[in-house]
A protein has these predicted regions:
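C-terminal extensions of enzymes
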Residues: 1-19, 25-31, 41-42, 145-151, ...
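Non-catalytic, usually N-terminal nucleic-acid engagement modules in DNA/RNA processing proteins
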Residues: 1-184, 298-301
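Conserved, mostly hydrophobic/aromatic
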Residues: 23, 56, 91, 133, ...
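Short, solvent-exposed loop/turn segments at secondary-structure junctions
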Residues: 32, 62-64, 95-96, 148-149, ...
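A non-catalytic, amphipathic alpha-helix used as a structural packing/dimerization or gating element
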Residues: 128, 132, 136, 159-170, ...
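Structural signal for hydrophobic packing residues in well-ordered secondary-structure cores
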Residues: 137, 168, 172-175, 179, ...
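Glycine- and acidic
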Residues: 149-154, 158, 218-224, 333-336
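Glycine-rich phosphate/ribose-binding loops and adjacent secondary-structure elements
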Residues: 162-165, 174, 178, 186, ...
Length: 390
């Protein structure tokens, strides 16, 4: 069922369509993050439809511990559970296992750790992650991997990447088995492998070559935006992405800001996800084409303009900065909800603009104009070769 159709290119940037059992994804795309099956900020799947969301992302670990993946399967899978008929990507739970668990023990078979909810002991390995994601019935499942710290010592990273490769082979074998079962929720579930290697470009390149041989449905670059600088992240993408299959979707995990996304697209990335738009929105920080603003600032107390003039999101079509600020100050849920809706709409609309620019063959000029308007680059410094990344 999966088919990746490359429509246009500009440098390394790609404009494509990814056909899945739950619909066609136009890329580049930003996936809206609903960790536990919902976007934080009282955002419904009906809202997601209205603001142009193409793909929702949920988390394997969190849905496993609550309400339980077996319960979700009994209820018909995550799509029916959420009332969402478009693509869903589930990440493997690996990042949460390695970042949330204070007590964990890594072995070849997998990881032992304690639940963040009640402390009970949990084991998760490649097979368990695939089984949970199969129960959820997501469109795209992510391979179980270890996300090594960005500044980890080289010997540790080498051992970690080798183990991640072995785990990926086990993930592929288990997914093939699960997709063949009669009672599987989604027999067309796809598997994306994850490139790791911290900030060691040669390890990343070697790993990219190895996992590319497995002929998976797509590939992700993981383990970035976890402590390294933006310059280091872009360097790793420059070095690594060319060694991943160009005719398969490429996903940059957990990234990021609007500037990060523009730079990622320029380096050949198709899929992005990040909690920034919802997290920032819940704290009154909203995105505009002139940069991010904090609605808690007193200067917006009597500002009757929408968050952004011309924006067609549910917040901007009806409400003023002053009113939304009042709601936020009063800790009224509606204020947070409106900010989250605006930010997600901003991201989704920016991705549509990126796709339009690639279709028209002017992505580079769009990117530079967007970064300049948002205050992310100084054109004089850029011309002199002193460009700074944000």
């Amino acid at each position: 069922m999966a088919e990746y159709k490359l429509l246009k290119t500009e440098g390394r940037a790609k404009r494509a369509e990814f056909h899945t059992v739950h619909g066609t994804i136009q890329t580049p795309v930003f996936m809206n993050v609903g960790t536990i099956g919902a976007i934080k900020g009282a955002v419904s799947t009906m809202d997601l439809q209205q603001i142009g969301t193409q793909v929702e992302l949920s988390n394997t670990y969190h849905l496993h511990v609550r309400p339980g993946d077996k319960i979700v399967k009994q209820l018909g899978g995550l799509h029916k559970f959420m009332v969402w008929d478009k693509p869903i990507l589930t990440d493997s739970g690996g990042f949460q296992v390695f970042s949330l668990a204070k007590l964990r023990k890594i072995k070849e078979e997998g990881v032992y750790f304690n639940s963040h909810i009640d402390g009970h002991k949990i084991f998760m390995g490649p097979e368990e992650s695939m089984q949970i994601q199969s129960n959820l019935g997501s469109t795209i499942a992510m391979a179980f991997d270890e996300c090594a710290p960005a500044l980890a010592e080289r010997p540790y990273v080498e051992a970690s990447v080798a183990r991640t490769t072995r785990w990926l082979e086990r993930c592929k074998k288990e997914m093939n088995r699960l997709n063949s079962l009669e009672d599987t929720v989604n027999k067309n579930q796809m598997l994306f492998g994850i490139n790791q290697g911290a900030i060691y470009a040669d390890i990343r390149i070697d790993h990219a070559k190895r996992i590319s041989e497995l002929d998976l449905d797509g590939y992700a670059v993981g383990g970035l935006a976890v402590g390294e600088t933006h310059e280091e992240m872009y360097y790793i993408l420059d070095e690594t992405v060319p060694y991943l299959p160009r005719k398969k979707p490429t996903y940059l995990m957990g990234v990021g800001t609007p500037a990060n996304i523009l730079e990622g697209v320029d380096r050949g990335i198709d899929f992005f996800d990040c909690v920034y738009p919802s997290r920032n929105g819940r704290h009154g920080h909203v995105y505009t084409n002139q940069g991010k603003i904090n609605l808690f600032n007193q200067k917006y107390e009597k500002d009757m303009r929408p968050i952004e003039e011309g924006c067609q999101c549910p917040a901007c079509r009806r409400y003023s900065r002053a009113y939304i600020r009042h709601l936020l100050k009063a800790k009224e849920m509606l204020g947070m909800r409106l900010c989250v809706l605006h930010n997600l709409y901003f991201y989704n609309t920016m991705m549509e603009e990126i796709r339009d620019a690639l279709d028209a063959g002017n992505f580079r000029s769009y990117k530079e104009e967007k970064l300049y308007n948002m205050g992310q680059i100084d054109r004089e410094k850029e011309m002199s070769g002193q460009k700074k990344f944000y």
